[in-house]
Amino acid sequence: MNRAHYLKTDIRRLIKNYPIYLGIVGVAISMWFSLEDSAFTEGMVNGNALDTYDLAVGMSGIMIAYVFCAFSYATVFCEDLEYKYARYSINRGNTWKYVVSKAVVVYGSSVITMVLGSLLFVASIRLKIPWTSEGLQDIFMEGMYGSLIAGEHYWSYVFLCALQMGM
């Protein structure tokens, strides 16, 4: 059994399992909780989505989001050992390929959960407030991925920031 079969099986198992979808929603909700009182004010943080997102990922509530990222597929080793699926898979293939496949899918699922949860959060705040305010855009222009803000590629900015957090 080659590595591609292990990966296909693990990815299929990930997609058919509901915890990844709960994890995505959990990441978005934990970002809402991270805003604390700012989530319930009229303009949220400075009246724009980028400042609100920046505050949400900078506060301590974001630590809960990492738990939701691990929630989606990190229990796979325990489940495989409990139901004796690990023994069956290793006997059919190779221990090294089995472990590498599981590790790749666990890592990938946590990154995907963080990215999609962050995009869900930003989409929900974007319904209420604009992307930026005129005078407050300079802070993001000097920071990481500032060229994306200058080109008004806000979704790409959020995607790359969430990808970096998920890694």
Residue ranges and their predicted role:
Residues 1-24:
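Aromatic- and glycine-rich beta-strand/loop motifs that create alpha-glucan
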Residues 76-109:
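Helix-loop-helix units of permease transmembrane domains in multi-pass membrane transporters
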Residues 10, 14, 89, 166-167:
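Generic transmembrane alpha-helix motif of multi-pass integral membrane proteins
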Residues 3-11, 96, 100, 104, ...:
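Alpha-helical membrane-protein architecture signal
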Residues 22-26, 100-101:
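Hydrophobic core positions of alpha-helical segments in small-molecule transporters
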